Swiss-Prot record:
InterPro entries: DUF5436. Pfam families: DUF5436. It comes from Vaccinia virus (strain Copenhagen) (VACV). This is Uncharacterized 11.2 kDa protein.
């Protein structure tokens, strides 16, 4: 049993990182949705893989970026706090 995946190549020209992520997700989903199912079991198997792929892409490109930004922001806030405390003790 073989499935046929018809891949339509596209070039992505985006400047904004959010637009690039969304475009990439849509391109990958487009590539994996266009297949020719041979049986119901094969169809269900492909849909499970597609669900895992979408979950991975959403986590990797969107949630991970937000967590990185929050972590960086928190680190900057901590440095600012300690510099203020140190400056008060010097006076």
């Amino acid at each position: 049993m073989r499935r046929c995946i018809h891949i339509k190549e596209r070039k992505i020209h985006m400047t904004n990182i959010v637009d690039r992520n969304v475009t990439f997700i849509l391109t990958v989903v487009h590539k994996y949705v266009r297949y020719v199912p041979h049986t119901v079991a094969n169809d269900a198997h492909n849909l499970v893989h597609l669900a895992h792929l979408i979950h991975f892409i959403i986590y990797f490109f969107i949630i991970r970026d937000v967590r990185k930004k929050k972590k960086k922001k928190k680190k900057n806030r901590t440095i600012y706090f300690f510099s203020n405390v140190y400056a008060r003790h010097i006076k």
